[in-house]
Amino acid sequence: FSIPGHSFKRIQQKREQQLMNKNMAFFEERLNKLKSEYKTLVNRENEIIEPGNGIFNRYKYPVLTAKHTPLFWQYDLNPATNPYLMQRFGINAVFNAGAIKFNDKYIVIARVEGNDRKSFFAVAESDNGIDNFRFWDNPVTMPETGNPDTNVYDIRLTKHEDGWIYGVFCSERKDLSKPDDTTAAI
């Protein structure tokens, strides 16, 4: 049908453009909120819990959590492919890190567990080892063998006299004798 001076197609295009503008505004508002929350978290100063025991200090906040992972790990930040800015890769937890001081920075390689309960390692660093840890842009890339691991955890680090830093960790492989049991590992 048509309205004098207008075509249905033109009206439909105008509505689609209005919807795209509304979605873009929603996307930008949500992204700004996520960025603000992330910036507040990673810049937050940790606080000593007083009175302590006189030997070491405990701190109020954990140095790394799932919320410390970069937003671009968790979200597709492209409004064309993720207009509602939905989380695409859920992080369940960040924990059990190996740590070392290297080049005047405190470096941790943490176990990062996805919502699928599978883990990978990622490096984060801080100037003081107490707060302001930031993950490097990319997780650790692990070489695969002919018998691939399904999970990795419990990394520990040591600087060797040869100048390299070595990480020793545990890994799991699928127990092929139990193909229907997704929890079976060796």
Where are these regions (language model features)?
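Beta-rich carbohydrate-recognition and catalytic domains
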Residues: 3-96, 100-150, 158-186
